[in-house]
A protein has these predicted regions:
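N-terminal active-site segment of His-dependent metallophosphoesterases
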Residues: 1-52, 60-70, 78-80
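Active-site metal-binding loops of divalent metal-dependent hydrolases
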Residues: 11-15, 35-37, 57-60, 86-88, ...
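Conserved beta-sheet core of the metallophosphoesterase superfamily
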Residues: 53, 80-82, 87-128
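Residue-level detector of beta-strand structural context in well-folded domains
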Residues: 70-72, 110
Length: 128
């Protein structure tokens, strides 16, 4: 996938898109949601702003949530990105981390660290 604009990363919305979250993502061309969406209206609201790629988290249940995978791998402008909700699931769900970036959420704590050339990034919680 090729984009010309910014990539926004959001997680743990738990059914809400706060105004400050929408504002922070306003100029993004692509939004990556790393789980705990909460309800489908969250993705609908974000899709009104940009293209959205989302995965489900541990609070995402019901038929609507089945539309979202547990993990997602994508390449954006040559950058290989893997998405998983819980950091502790990375060894199991992403055993072959042949990527440039691993995005995750769940802990509600922002995290950014580069290890062996791979960026591990958690945006923190955007919800209640």
């Amino acid at each position: 996938m090729r984009i010309n604009g910014d990539i926004g990363v959001i997680s743990d919305t738990h059914g809400q898109v706060r105004p400050e979250g929408q504002s922070a993502l306003a100029d993004c061309e692509l939004i990556l949601h790393v789980g705990d969406i909460g309800k489908p209206e969250v993705v609908d609201a974000l899709t009104g702003q940009a293209q959205v790629v989302a995965i489900r988290g541990n609070v995402d249940h019901g038929d609507w949530a089945l539309a979202y995978p547990e993990t997602q791998e994508l390449t954006v402008n040559g950058l290989r990105i893997q998405m998983v909700h819980r950091q502790q699931d990375i060894p199991t769900l992403l055993p072959d981390r042949s990527c440039d970036v691993v995005l995750f959420g769940h802990s509600h704590k922002p995290f950014s660290e580069t290890r062996e050339g791979v960026l591990y990034f958690n945006p923190g919680s955007a919800g209640p």
